[in-house]
């Protein structure tokens, strides 16, 4: 059963909000309203995709992440850099310098997430080979914002989600167990940290939708870590970190999952609006020819996350150069290339740690079913009387959203400017008619005489 209270890393600073409704129109789940000149987030609908934050001209939205002070809570700290971090730097900066910079910031150990990506890619490939009889395409499970979007708007597609862990979750499970055994430490004293390019991954650490128990201790804002790394890159000691191949590195950009799993009939889509449109098509069973759809809420994939420091096009160029340079040193065969790096023992299998997604109840008009039906009928009546322009001037994202708010007692019909104008016109016509019925006033004669006497 879905929780009734949700944690959100995307938060609104109302003092900065100007009530411009830009965020209202951008939100894919209609989770924002503007009331009394300020935006409000509806927590049961928000999926922490960050679309509101990326489109707010007043920077009224912020993302709550962890700080490096949190390292002091643990005896041993492991950081999980992903390709999205490497992409912030030009390809001529060695990964060893970035890893050394992370150690200079206080981390004891580094584990490259791209290596975990290859294990997950193999799980995806195997599952597709054995998948028979069910609806296609299957939908990638690596983006938490997409999973939440499906929970809220497309619950019928939950059964088509690929049942594998996100690489960072699998990496966290592996490194904490392995480090605890190697360092002879209880797991509670080991901190495992992610450097996140987006808010949805931070939210998933605090309240996961697909992992029974995350082993991640928290995550840091990628742009903040990037700024610190610029001052701490490299050093005399060069760290050796076991890393993945070019196929694991490719997961940072859109299309990387498909390439690493060797899927032919597949589609890669990025940007929450585009993802929404594709999910609508899948929901109507219009893409049965596809085996797999790779979805990223952020434009450009994880490289376009709102917490990234570098422009997403520059970051993509940086990453693809790294991929090209690494691929030039590898065998031609994808499977042979990945076999050279996948040498870890007892890497976790997704089925042991993943939990089943459940729909998230979004629009519940009332706890009492009879009362809910009455409200629904009333909502339909109100909606029929609204203009249907979905202009957003009322503070709701659509006329249907306003109708729902009205029956819930959270808005009024005259919040619609067209209804307000009609009401004002009706009142003015009434006042005009009333004015016509009032007798014409004549000044008493003695007033005029008084004025003449004064002269």
Where in this protein do the model-derived segments appear?
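Iron-sulfur cluster-binding cysteine motifs and their immediate structural context
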Residues: 2-3, 9-14, 18-42, 47, ...
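Short gly/ser/thr-rich secondary-structure transition/capping motifs
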Residues: 7-8, 122
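Iron-sulfur-associated redox domains of electron-transfer enzymes in respiratory
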Residues: 62-392, 397-455
